[in-house]
From Swiss-Prot:
The modification Phosphoserine is found at S375, S377. GO terms for cellular component: cytosol; membrane; nucleus. Belongs to the PP2C family. Binds 2 magnesium or manganese ions per subunit. It comes from Oryctolagus cuniculus (Rabbit). A lipid is attached at G2 (N-myristoyl glycine). Enzyme with a broad specificity. Negatively regulates TGF-beta signaling through dephosphorylating SMAD2 and SMAD3, resulting in their dissociation from SMAD4, nuclear export of the SMADs and termination of the TGF-beta-mediated signaling. Dephosphorylates PRKAA1 and PRKAA2. Plays an important role in the termination of TNF-alpha-mediated NF-kappa-B activation through dephosphorylating and inactivating IKBKB/IKKB. N-myristoylation is essential for the recognition of its substrates for dephosphorylation. This is Protein phosphatase 1A.
Length: 382
């Protein structure tokens, strides 16, 4: 289940890059969790004749970070170096790629199992994996677990991966056929995902193949033909993001942020902060990959954003002045603002996405501010 800190760790790891007609940014934050178990991969230009291909992935570890870390360093090699992926001479076909991805997952899982056995089963960790392999003609969505990826095309969610949960009928059938059960929506009442890399305690049913175990390492792979005119961006994120934001919400929020800044790291940081303030208690990681026709910065949107920030600053000042000598706490300020009809809040993010703006004004104007106050708590905020 995971243990929690008294205060969230809000320091972020960031990266960004560009190439092959793509731009990407990423952000990850430990948040309320005692350990940071997420990992990620971002590679533009693959080796072995695949210079025009790119690969991105997010790994959400559980019961430790070992599997997530190993996969972020080695999964891509297992995918692109197996014979199913390479196929015959020339560029791999769509079926080569899909089969190679599946083979790569099974191979790395078996490799990690052997390594774990050599250590007498010392590593009990596991990890989800969600990724995209982007060729000049296709985008291959890859998913194993309950992290999620989506494609925004022509201002709408065009595709999103399906979470692998034990309560899903097909997943539940496999679990039961392997002698397991689904209780409180968990495998044997314990694990909240039905597919993952690692988790070898759930992969030891004799007489069953690797994809027939209580927990399967087999990914779902979907190939989507690229559309130069309509493809805008891809979001890959762990469930710490999706727990508090739906597909359309996050798509709308990211699109609105891209209209006010072209800094993809900043956009990802805003996603992570907003999800923290919406109540996410998990590690959070997000990768944003933009195609050439992603939304561009709009002077009108920038102006509206500045006007909104100014409006919020004035309202915070008014709320503080109205209280006279007794300065209200930040929770009271946020609740007051939440009860108002504030125009032009970012879609999907709403007031939570402006928490940093509100808090900065509050701290500047509050003469009694205690630096030890836990201003990051979201308990009972709304």
């Amino acid at each position: 289940m995971g243990a929690f800190l008294d205060k969230p760790k809000m320091e972020k790891h960031n990266a960004q890059g560009q190439g092959n007609g793509l731009r990407y940014g990423l952000s990850s934050m430990q948040g309320w969790r005692v350990e940071m178990e997420d990992a990620h991969t971002a590679v533009i230009g693959l080796p072995s004749g695949l210079e025009t291909w790119s690969f991105f992935a997010v790994y959400d570890g559980h019961a430790g970070s070992q599997v997530a870390k190993y996969c972020c360093e080695h999964l891509l090699d297992h995918i692109t170096n197996n014979q199913d992926f390479k196929g015959s001479a020339g560029a791999p076909s769509v079926e080569n790629v899909k089969n190679g991805i599946r083979t790569g997952f099974l191979e790395i899982d078996e490799h990690m199992r052997v390594m774990s056995e050599k250590k007498h089963g010392a590593d009990r960790s596991g990890s989800t994996a969600v990724g995209v392999l982007i060729s000049p003609q296709h985008t291959y969505f890859i998913n194993c677990g309950d992290s999620r990826g989506l494609l925004c095309r022509n201002r709408k969610v065009h595709f999103f991966t399906q979470d692998h949960k034990p309560s899903n009928p097909l997943e539940k059938e496999r679990i039961q056929n392997a002698g397991g059960s689904v209780m409180i929506q968990r495998v044997n009442g314990s694990l909240a995902v039905s597919r993952a890399l690692g988790d070898f305690d759930y992969k030891c049913v004799h007489g069953k193949g690797p994809t027939e175990q209580l927990v399967s390492p087999e990914p779902e792979v979907h190939d989507i033909e690229r559309s130069e005119e309509d493809d805008q961006f891809i979001i890959l994120a762990c469930d710490g993001i999706w727990d508090v934001m739906g597909n359309e919400e996050l798509c709308d929020f990211v699109r609105s942020r891209l209209e006010v800044t072209d800094d993809l790291e900043k956009v990802c940081n805003e996603v992570v902060d907003t999800c923290l303030y919406k109540g996410s208690r998990d590690n959070m990681s997000v990768i944003l990959i933009c195609f050439p026709n992603a939304p561009k910065v709009s002077p009108e949107a920038v102006k509206k954003e500045a006007e909104l920030d100014k409006y919020l600053e004035c309202r915070v000042e008014e709320i503080l002045k109205k209280q006279g000598e007794g300065v209200p706490d930040l929770v009271h300020v946020m609740r007051t603002l939440a009860s108002e009809n504030i125009p032009s809040l970012p879609p999907g993010g709403e007031l939570a996405s402006k928490r940093n703006v509100i808090e900065a004004v509050y701290n500047r104007l509050n003469p009694y501010k205690n630096d030890d106050t836990d201003s990051t708590s979201t308990d009972d905020m709304w």
